[in-house]
C-alpha cells in the first residue's frame, strides 16, 4: 500500500496520480495555512474534497492493507442502502482510481460530516457547564447502539474520533474499515481499534468480524458520558485531550475494585451499569457480552413513554323527551 508521504504527494498533484474524472475535475480543500484538509484515520488518510458540482466529500485513501477491501466496501454500502440510518453516511468505492509507482489502488468517497469528535464535544459541554447537553448525548448514543443491535451489525472501531457530534446534537459514525454486516460473516477482524475502548483480553482473541464487537466499547463510552453528565469534575479537559487512545478512563484504571467507588453515587441505574462492566471484564470471549441497549433497558434509565389513553366520550340522553313520547 502507498505510504502516508506518497499519498500526501498524490493529493497535492492530482492530475499525475488519479485516474477517474470525479477526482480529476475536483479539488482537495485546504486549511487556512494552505495545507490539504486532512483527518487521521486508523488505516487511511481522509481528505476534505470538493467535486466539480460543489459537493463536499471525504476522500479516503488507504495506507495499510485490508484484505478484500473492495468486497467489504461493497457489502457495507449495499447494506446501508437497504437499511437507511441517520447514524451512517453514504459512500462509494471506486476501483483503480489512484496510481502510485505503477500500481492502481481503490479509493472511497464518503459524504463529509462537519461535526466535532465526541471528546471535544464533551470538553465544550463541561467548560460551558451544559450538563443537559451531556445527558442528551448519552441518550443519543444509547439510541445509536440500539439501532446497531436492531440491524445485527457492528461498527467495530467505536472511539471518540469516529463518532462525530453535529450542531443539532445528533451523531454520525465514520470510518467503516472494521464494520460487520451479515454479508461479511467469516471475514477477518483486522483493525482492533484504540486499546482504551476495547476489552483488555477478548478483542485481541477475536478472529472474525462479529455483530457483538462493539458491546464493550458501547458500555465504556456510555458509562463515561453518563458519569460526567452527573459529575463534571471527573473531566479534566487538559488531561483527556492529551490521552489520545481513551475517552476518560484507562481500562487498567477501571478494574473491578476501583470502579466500585462510583457505585454508591446517587445516580439512577449506575450500580447496575457498574455491575455489568465488572461482568464484562470477567469474560474472555466477546460473544458472552451484552449490547448496551439491553443493559440500559434493564436499568430502566429511560422508562418507556406511555401514551395516555383517551377518555371515553360521555353521551347524554334527554330522558324527559323519551318519557314524554312514551306517555303519548
Over which residues does each language-model region extend?
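Conserved end of the kinase activation segment
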Residues: 202-212
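ATP-binding glycine-rich loop module of kinase domains
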Residues: 34-36, 42-89
Amino acid at each position: 500500500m502507498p505510504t502516508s508521504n506518497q499519498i500526501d504527494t498524490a493529493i497535492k498533484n492530482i492530475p499525475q496520480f488519479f485516474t477517474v474524472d470525479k477526482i480529476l475535475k475536483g479539488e482537495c480543500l485546504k486549511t487556512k495555512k494552505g495545507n490539504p484538509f486532512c483527518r487521521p484515520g486508523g488505516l487511511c488518510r481522509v481528505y476534505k474534497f470538493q467535486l466539480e458540482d460543489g459537493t463536499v466529500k471525504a476522500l479516503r485513501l488507504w495506507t495499510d492493507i485490508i484484505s478484500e477491501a473492495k468486497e467489504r466496501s461493497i457489502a457495507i454500502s449495499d447494506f446501508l442502502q437497504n437499511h437507511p440510518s441517520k447514524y451512517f453516511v453514504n459512500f462509494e468505492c471506486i476501483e483503480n482510481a489512484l496510481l502510485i509507482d505503477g500500481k492502481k489502488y481503490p479509493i472511497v468517497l464518503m459524504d463529509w460530516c462537519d461535526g466535532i469528535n465526541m471528546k471535544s464535544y464533551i470538553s465544550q459541554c463541561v467548560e460551558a457547564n451544559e450538563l443537559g447537553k451531556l445527558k442528551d448525548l448519552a441518550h443519543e448514543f444509547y439510541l445509536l447502539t440500539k439501532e446497531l443491535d436492531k440491524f445485527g451489525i457492528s461498527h467495530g472501531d467505536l472511539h471518540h474520533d469516529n463518532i462525530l457530534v453535529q450542531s443539532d446534537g445528533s451523531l454520525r459514525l465514520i470510518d467503516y474499515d472494521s464494520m460487520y454486516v451479515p454479508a461479511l460473516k467469516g471475514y477477518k477482524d483486522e483493525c482492533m481499534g484504540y486499546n482504551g475502548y476495547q476489552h483488555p483480553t477478548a478483542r485481541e482473541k477475536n478472529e472474525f468480524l462479529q455483530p457483538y464487537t462493539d458491546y464493550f466499547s458501547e458500555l465504556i463510552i456510555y458509562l463515561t458520558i453518563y458519569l460526567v453528565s452527573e459529575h463534571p469534575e471527573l473531566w479534566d479537559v487538559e488531561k483527556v485531550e492529551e490521552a489520545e487512545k481513551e475517552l476518560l478512563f484507562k481500562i487498567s484504571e477501571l478494574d473491578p475494585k476501583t470502579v466500585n467507588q462510583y457505585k454508591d453515587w446517587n445516580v439512577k441505574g449506575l450500580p447496575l451499569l457498574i455491575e455489568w462492566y465488572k461482568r464484562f471484564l470477567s469474560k474472555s470471549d466477546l460473544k458472552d457480552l451484552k449490547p448496551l441497549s439491553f443493559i440500559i433497558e434493564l436499568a430502566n434509565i429511560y422508562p418507556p413513554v406511555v401514551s395516555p389513553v383517551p377518555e371515553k366520550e360521555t353521551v347524554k340522553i334527554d330522558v324527559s323527551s323519551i318519557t314524554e313520547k312514551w306517555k303519548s
